[in-house]
Structure formats: C-alpha cells, structure tokens
Amino acid sequence: QSCTMAGIVNAGFATPSDGVNFFFVFSGMQIGPYQLAGNLVLAPMAGVTDAAFRVICLRHGAAYAVGEMAASGSHLLHTEMTRRRYTCDPRERFAVVQILGADPAEMANAAALAQECGAAMVDVNFGCPARVVCGKACGSAVMRDPKLAGDILRAVASAVTIPVSVKMRTGWDEDMKTSVEIAKMAQDAGFCLVTVHGRTRAQRFTGTVNRIDIAEVVRAVQIPVIANGDVTTPGEALEMMRQTQAAGVMIGRGACGNPWLFSRTQALIDGKPDPGAPT
C-alpha cells in the first residue's frame, strides 16, 4: 500500500478574474499501482454519488470518485441498498468504496468485502456529521475517541491488500480538534491518503471552512492530504490548494449539476487555459 505524488511539477494557475496568485502544484497522483492523471476527487454524498453520477464526473475529469457511504454492520451487509453501495461499476478504473462504522472488527470485514467486490481503494468515513450517524458513534463522532479511531484504522489496514484512505473533519467541535492526531495514526497504520473537510462536526455545513486546520494536517504527515469544503469554482479549488498546500481537492456539492468543474480546474492545474462550461 503506497501513495505518492507524481514526480513532474507543473505550473498551476488561475485567470486574473479568479484572484488567485501563481503557484506550483504536483499534477497527478499515484496510489499503489494506479497512476491517476488528476488532483481532483468527487466526494461521497449519500443519495448522490451513485455509479451513474460517479461515471459522469470521471468522464469530466475527476481523478477518482468515492461512492456513497456503505454500512459495515453485519446485519446490514446483505440488504439491497448496502450491497449496491459495495458494487463497483466496471467503467470505474479506480473504484473507491467508503465504509462507515464504529466496530473495528466489523470495519475490517467491510473492508475485505469491498476488496472482494472489486474496489481499488477503501475509504474510512470519519466525517459524516448526520445526527443519525453520529448517534450510533459513527462518522465524525469517532473523532471524539482517538483510541477507537486508531483501532479502526489499524483493523481496516490489516484486512486488505489494496490502498486505504480516511476522510475526516477537523474535529468534533472547536474544543476537540483531533484531525492532526488521527491523520498521524492513519499514516502509522499504513494509510496512503487522508482527506480533510475543513469544518468541525458541530458546524455541519455552516460557517467558514478552516483552511488553516487543513494546512496543519498537511504539515503533520508525509502522505498526501486532500482538502475538502465549499469548492464551487476553479478559482476556489486553486485557492484551496494554494492556502493548504494539499495534494488535491475533493469536490462535493459544487459538482452537482456542474461536473465540468473537474475538467475546468484540472486544466488550470496542468497549465492550460480554462475550457469553460459547455454552452
């Protein structure tokens, strides 16, 4: 399990109207045996990132797309909805299954199932802020318990031979920010990638994304970090990368109805003109 940035440095830039200064980024990512051409990722969104939408975003320039979170509870693994979320579309060259749970053994079994179903990478959900999820001590609620988080990360990494990643928030609330600690645990467990949404669970989707907190995670680990939160334009994506020095950007709600946001932003990262939205 390994993940490194591609060795070629390209100039990433935005147009003057975007208000982003010139800066340098690595173009592309290598995750295990997979060389990915871009730096932009479709975020997992329940009820949105089904196979059809993932393929649309991949065709419009996303490096990879994360499926809807899949439950890890043994009593749920054989339900139709859960099995569908573990299923990888053959059109996805690099399929990613995200698993959700609070029991290390069940999460390990879920990771193994994802690999059996054809996933190229398993992503662990420590980021979902939904009340029904956190009420079961899952999603971002795990960030209140770094010991449990570490146990889950180690169990998942030990259960599969494919790359593993984790998506998290900056912490539970302003008084309990554990993203740096958990990112270090992920790195030590053998995870290849960390994605950070720049809000606490308490914020949910309100308030301002804290790019300083994301940058602290970037500085704390040697594995690539993907930045996430409130990216709806190419300029915002490039500014996120500039301010955080993240390896890439994960785009969620900004891609809904706007999948060409990926190709437009990646063109700028690669030093090419913005092709613009279709007319």
Regions from the PLM with identified roles:
Residues 11-14:
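Short hydrophobic alpha-helical segments enriched in small aliphatic residues
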Residues 18-279:
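Flavin-dependent oxidoreductase catalytic cores
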Residues 6-9:
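Residues marking helix boundaries in flexible regions
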